[in-house]
Amino acid sequence: MTLTKRIIPCIDVDVDENGDAAVYTGVNFEDLEYTGDPVEMAKAYNESGADEFVFLDITASAEGRETMLDTVSAVADEVFIPLTVGGGIRTRADIKETLRAGADKVSINSGAIAEPDLINEGAAAFGSQCIVISVDARRRFDSEGEHYTEVDGESCWFECTVKGGREGTGLDVIEWATEAEERGAGELFVNSIDADGTKDGYDIPLMKAVCDTVSTPVIASSGCGSPEDMEEVFVDAGADAGLAASIFHFGEYSIAETKEYLDSKGIPVRL
């Protein structure tokens, strides 16, 4: 049986100047602009035909604070499709509290790189299906990597970054994806700093490299500018889900239009 490809909208949430949760959109993890209210946007996406929904607290890890659980709870009250929440999750207790607030899955990046055993502990306590390992990847054109890919005629490797892309780790994405899968991650959520917000398409070399390495489902993120970009990441890279933000936030394409296009190309989606 062919599994359907999932279409997933995502909101990047930060604290605004009044201390309230707000959705922001940026480019290359920078130049953030106010986009809307997280609860209202969640409600709209719940009714849009989305397969899942992702809520990312984009500064919790960098600022060393806890995830906005009150906002997560308010969003969960409006969302009746699987909800993944990420940002600031560092401990088993954080996982438990985030799930208790209404998340179906947690997305962990910096916390898992700092304490890889958190993946094992989370999978054992809550089930692998709850543990999504997020990777913020950045291209590097030097000799310090483990696994190299041809990109625009040059050889590059992909580095894991942490704290919202602010810090490099020296850790090769392919090595980390393999380890995360072995430790019990139920999904991999792969972001590209180079493609983020550009609407020029997903980072296909990155996504293909990860998809070719692991059997765990891969959510492709960053760079989607059209339904054609989703077709490309499904067909050419082998991703299991396509995540997008700005093209949906600003009404450039609807989720229904995206699914209809993919269906017309023979890509299995839930209509």
Curated annotation (Swiss-Prot):
Query: What's a single GO CC term here?
Result: cytoplasm
Q: Which GO terms describe its biological process?
A: L-histidine biosynthetic process
Alphabetically sorted, this entry's keywords are:
Amino-acid biosynthesis, Cytoplasm, Histidine biosynthesis, Lyase
Which Enzyme Commission numbers does its entry carry? Answer: 4.3.2.10
Q: Where in the cell is it found?
A: Cytoplasm
Signal peptide annotation: none
Q: Which reaction does it catalyse?
A: 5-[(5-phospho-1-deoxy-D-ribulos-1-ylimino)methylamino]-1-(5-phospho-beta-D-ribosyl)imidazole-4-carboxamide + L-glutamine = D-erythro-1-(imidazol-4-yl)glycerol 3-phosphate + 5-amino-1-(5-phospho-beta-D-ribosyl)imidazole-4-carboxamide + L-glutamate + H(+)
GO molecular function per UniProt: imidazoleglycerol-phosphate synthase activity; lyase activity
Give the residues annotated as active site: 12, 136
Q: Where are the transmembrane segments?
A: none
* Metabolic or biological pathway: Amino-acid biosynthesis; L-histidine biosynthesis; L-histidine from 5-phospho-alpha-D-ribose 1-diphosphate: step 5/9
Judging by the UniProt lineage, the source's domain of life is Archaea
Indicate where this protein is primarily found: cytoplasm
Sequence similarity: Belongs to the HisA/HisF family.
Oligomeric and partner information = Heterodimer of HisH and HisF.
Please explain the role this protein plays, according to its UniProt record. Answer: IGPS catalyzes the conversion of PRFAR and glutamine to IGP, AICAR and glutamate. The HisF subunit catalyzes the cyclization activity that produces IGP and AICAR from PRFAR using the ammonia provided by the HisH subunit.
- Return the protein name: Imidazole glycerol phosphate synthase subunit HisF
- Specify the species: Haloarcula marismortui (strain ATCC 43049 / DSM 3752 / JCM 8966 / VKM B-1809) (Halobacterium marismortui)
Its organism's taxonomic lineage begins at:
Archaea, Methanobacteriati, Methanobacteriota, Stenosarchaea group, Halobacteria
